[in-house]
């Protein structure tokens, strides 16, 4: 069991560090809005994984992924939500983040945003279906408990990796905040990241 879990931790670390929509999103948010906003987003993204773990453990993920209409519907909802977020950033004032009078971030709202993004990304479901069964140490007995152990391990490791990304990006954000001209660049960077993730979800 221990050897299998250690292998799973290594695999999770490598996957979390590999360029992908989630860590790119966390990095973008940390650069644009600071480490606290990025950590709130990270907490939301990771918390959504417990739902995917539950769906996997009880066989619901397999049912969803084998239903083309339902699976496609989730993909469309996820893409539309991301495009809505891109539009919200587009409508925002690019200079707000650099003003001393800028409104405080609603971290609860950012957390919820991360959760919704995770839940409406069916590729996370496919990822769990492909990865987790490979690391069951007793495939014939009590797989529900094993899936939850793997799920919690995945969440902890991913949060640590994404948290480091958020902190590193946040330290750069402090420097960027001194230059008002970066506001427009970061605004459009966020928009492009949202659109790119939406496209990633829709592509088969």
Predicted segments, located by residue:
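Juxtamembrane transmembrane-helix termini in multi-pass membrane transport proteins
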Residues: 2-72, 130-150, 154-155
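Hydrophobic/aromatic residues within the transmembrane alpha-helices of Major Facilitator Superfamily
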Residues: 13, 17, 50-51, 87, ...
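Juxtamembrane helix-boundary/capping and inter-helix hinge elements in multi-pass membrane proteins
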Residues: 30-37, 105, 177-181
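Membrane helix-loop-helix hairpins that form the core translocation module of multi-pass transporters
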Residues: 36-109, 168
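Hydrophobic alpha-helical transmembrane segments in multi-pass integral membrane proteins
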Residues: 53-57, 119-125, 193-204
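Selective transmembrane alpha-helices of multi-pass membrane proteins
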Residues: 66-94, 161-165, 173-204
């Amino acid at each position: 069991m221990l050897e299998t879990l250690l292998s799973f931790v290594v695999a999770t670390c490598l996957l979390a560090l590999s360029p992908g929509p989630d860590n790119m999103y966390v990095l973008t948010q940390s650069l644009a809005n600071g480490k606290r906003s990025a950590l709130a987003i990270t907490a939301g993204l990771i918390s959504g994984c417990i739902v995917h773990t539950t769906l996997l453990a009880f066989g619901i993920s397999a049912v969803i992924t084998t239903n083309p209409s339902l699976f496609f519907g989730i993909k469309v909802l996820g893409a539309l939500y991301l495009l809505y977020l891109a539009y919200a950033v587009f409508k925002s004032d690019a200079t707000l983040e650099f003003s001393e009078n800028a409104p405080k971030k609603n971290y609860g709202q950012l957390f919820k945003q991360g959760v919704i993004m995770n839940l409406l990304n069916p590729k996370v479901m496919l990822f769990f279906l492909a990865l987790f069964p490979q690391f069951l140490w007793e495939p014939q007995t009590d797989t529900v408990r094993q899936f939850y152990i793997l799920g919690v391990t995945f969440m902890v490791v991913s949060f640590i990796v994404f948290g480091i990304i958020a902190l590193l990006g946040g330290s750069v954000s402090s420097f960027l905040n001194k230059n008002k001209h970066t506001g427009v660049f970061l605004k459009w960077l966020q928009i492009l990241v949202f659109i790119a993730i939406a496209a990633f979800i829709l592509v088969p």
